[in-house]
Amino acid sequence: DYCMRQYIRQTTELRSYFHAGTQGLLEETLHTSQAKLPLEELEMLQDLIDRVLSGRYSYEAGEERLNLSNGKYVKINFASSGQQETVWVFNLLFYHLMQSQPTFLVVEEPESHLFPNSQKLIAEALAVFGHGRNRVLVTTHSPYILGTFNNLLYASELQNRGHDADSIVPPLQQLSQERTAAFYLEGGLVERAIEDGFVCNELIDGASDEINGELERLL
């Protein structure tokens, strides 16, 4: 489909930009360009990338690598499924965050092959990317992704009411209710999934409620 073709095209065309990884790309741009970059957002995104990947991507000698803290590297095709799935999501977020023009990205199931904590971190990375002029369309089945988005929405709402949410959730990760929408697809129909500014709880907790109810009956 169109989105997949664009994804393949971009990952192929942009590999050489990452010969020294995301940090190398940033340093090269700072030395060669007068463009004003969102350094705070990029620093926060880099931290989230490092925490999920546990290494840094580079494209060297015609191969994609994940460089480890001990000086060794793993070829991407030998990395974990989660690392393989997310490395180019992160690369594209980082690259487009550096660009001067607004970007609309479609990210399909960012939770694939990730532990719950990493799902939370990638949701926060998507929020950082979409904090300014950029837009992101996310498709997901993950209650952890949805739950994280709800926390980021709630933090923004509390901050607007005069409460100190910034000390818990950084402002660059907070999601504005006015700029956030959610929809639920079932039986070929699309329904709104936002209620009072938040993703509907039944979408997040429905499976857990059913599992817990079954456990209670067993006990």
Question: Where on the chain are the PLM-derived regions?
Answer:
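Phosphate-coordinating catalytic segments in nucleotide- and nucleic-acid-processing enzymes
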Residues: D1-P102, A125, P171-A181, E186-L219
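Walker B motif beta-strand of ABC-family P-loop ATPases
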Residues: F104-V106
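Walker B catalytic acidic pair
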Residues: E108-P110
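Helical segment within the ABC ATPase nucleotide-binding domain
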Residues: Q119-H131
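Conserved H-loop
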Residues: N134-Y144
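Conserved catalytic segment of ABC-fold P-loop ATPases
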Residues: G147-Q159, S167-F183
